[in-house]
Amino acid sequence: MIMRYRAYNAFNKDKSLEILFRPNPVRWMDNFVGNDNPIRDVANWSSEIKFLKDGKISDEIRNMPQDKGGIYMFYLKGPNLPFAEYYILYIGRALYTPSENICKRAMHYLKDERYMIQEMFDNWKNDLYYRYFPDTDNIAIEKNEIALIRSIVPTYNEDIPNKIEELPKVKAF
């Protein structure tokens, strides 16, 4: 009887950590950022950062640029195939303004009160990795965030933005 109880508890604990991933090639292509978009080149992204070290925000996060905005993501990295086993949990953006930048945005996450963000940290805080794509073009930052969220549909992004439709430019007069 004890074995069943323990197995049941282990199963329920495992179940609480399950995450739904939604791979969909049609959605990928429908929200494709374009071959010439610099966000597609891994060399333009930061190196991998372990978000927390010993329960505190890592020095790498604290030392991120304060003169850039950009796109960022929280993800898990599996231990068995660390070169290929990635699970994107959240994608966000930090606009570049006098009061906002990529470093300030990252530092805010431990105090974030949104339910989904709290759940992400409750379940995964010791396993979260972080990468960012620095940028100062706020229009590009917003477009890239929308395209990436719509194509990947990360588990902890509560809102999936509407698609941006760009109409051809026409002369006003």
Feature map (PLM): residue ranges:
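Boundary/linker segments flanking structured domains
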Residues: 1-89, 93-173
